[in-house]
Amino acid sequence: MQDNEIFEKVQDIVAEQLGIEKTIVTREANFSSDLGADSLDTVELVMAIEEKFAIEIPDEDAEKITNLSEVVDFIKSKLNTISV
């Protein structure tokens, strides 16, 4: 799966979960300060991403992820591990 494809899927999830326009969900947008996500929103985002990509994001990793770019990198690393 390509970087852009992952980004677009995550962008859709974030926009839908937070009820915001897809255009403001950029790679560098911070979930809390830029997109207005609270801690419950973040948990729901992680769960939706885990379900969409059939991966598990451990809590300690989820706490470090603050924007879409970091999510995309994490998903790519997980998918590469699975396919190897």
Swiss-Prot record:
What Gene Ontology molecular function terms does this protein carry? acyl binding; acyl carrier activity
Record's comment on post-translational modification: 4'-phosphopantetheine is transferred from CoA to a specific serine of apo-ACP by AcpS. This modification is essential for activity because fatty acids are bound in thioester linkage to the sulfhydryl of the prosthetic group.
Top-level taxon: Eukaryota
* Keywords assigned by UniProt, alphabetized: Chloroplast, Fatty acid biosynthesis, Fatty acid metabolism, Lipid biosynthesis, Lipid metabolism, Phosphopantetheine, Phosphoprotein, Plastid
Q: Which SUPFAM superfamilies match?
A: ACP-like
Q: What is its main location?
A: plastid
> Among its keywords, does the record have Plastid?
yes
User: Subcellular localization, per the record?
Assistant: Plastid, Chloroplast
Q: Write out the pathway annotation from the protein's UniProt entry.
A: Lipid metabolism; fatty acid biosynthesis
Which parts of the sequence belong to the Carrier domain? 4-79
What's one GO BP annotation on this UniProt entry? Answer: lipid A biosynthetic process
Give the O-(pantetheine 4'-phosphoryl)serine positions (modified residues): S39
InterPro entries according to UniProt: ACP, ACP-like_sf, PP-bd_ACP, Ppantetheine_attach_site
| A GO cellular component annotation in the UniProt record | membrane
PROSITE patterns per record: CARRIER, PHOSPHOPANTETHEINE
Which family would the database say this protein is a member of?
Answer: Belongs to the acyl carrier protein (ACP) family.
Q: What does this protein do?
A: Carrier of the growing fatty acid chain in fatty acid biosynthesis.
Q: What is this protein called?
A: Acyl carrier protein
Q: Which organism is it from?
A: Porphyra purpurea (Red seaweed)
